[in-house]
């Protein structure tokens, strides 16, 4: 029997992060003078760290192992887990997160200033990268999920054309 208890807590974490980022994005849209730097300084670093853990947890669950052990495990993706991540709405929230983080990420990758907010900016960049990794693993070897995510091909192509690949290792 597949243990899916992690789905609810992961869903709650996604909803919380997307809500916070959506609120911050609305503030930015209402006041264009607010910089992305100011926006992210208002984020709680603990929230970002815990969300990084959620993204790694979900990616590892697809393979039935920990994130850091995916390659060495030799496991194939578990189709039931991939399907659950789409059916529970986590995949939709993941796309919203990627959409919200795109502009801030572009600013982060183009700014190498050593500053007090560097740790937060690095965490935001890591969330952006892990979000794309999770999308890749949700669709791996699963045609139904590839079709589901195909509605966002334009978004993925736009991002791939403009993101500095050397920034994401």
Roles of regions detected by a PLM:
Residues 1-169:
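Elongated alpha-helical scaffolds that mediate protein-protein interactions in large eukaryotic proteins
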């Amino acid at each position: 029997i597949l243990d899916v208890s992690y789905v609810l807590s992961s869903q709650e974490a996604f909803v919380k992060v997307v809500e916070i980022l959506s609120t911050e994005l609305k503030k930015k849209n209402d006041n264009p003078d607010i910089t992305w730097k100011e926006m992210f300084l208002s984020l709680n670093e603990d929230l970002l760290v815990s969300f990084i853990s959620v993204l790694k947890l979900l990616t590892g669950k697809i393979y039935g192992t920990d994130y850091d052990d995916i390659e060495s495990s030799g496991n194939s993706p578990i189709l039931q887990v991939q399907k659950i991540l789409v059916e529970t709405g986590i995949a939709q929230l993941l796309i919203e997160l990627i959409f919200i983080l795109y502009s801030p990420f572009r600013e982060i990758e183009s700014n190498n200033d050593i500053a007090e907010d560097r740790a937060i900016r690095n965490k935001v960049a890591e969330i952006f990268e892990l979000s794309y990794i999770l999308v890749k693993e949700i669709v791996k070897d699963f045609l139904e999920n590839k079709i589901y995510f195909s509605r966002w091909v334009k978004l993925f192509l736009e991002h791939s054309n403009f993101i500095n690949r050397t920034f994401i290792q």
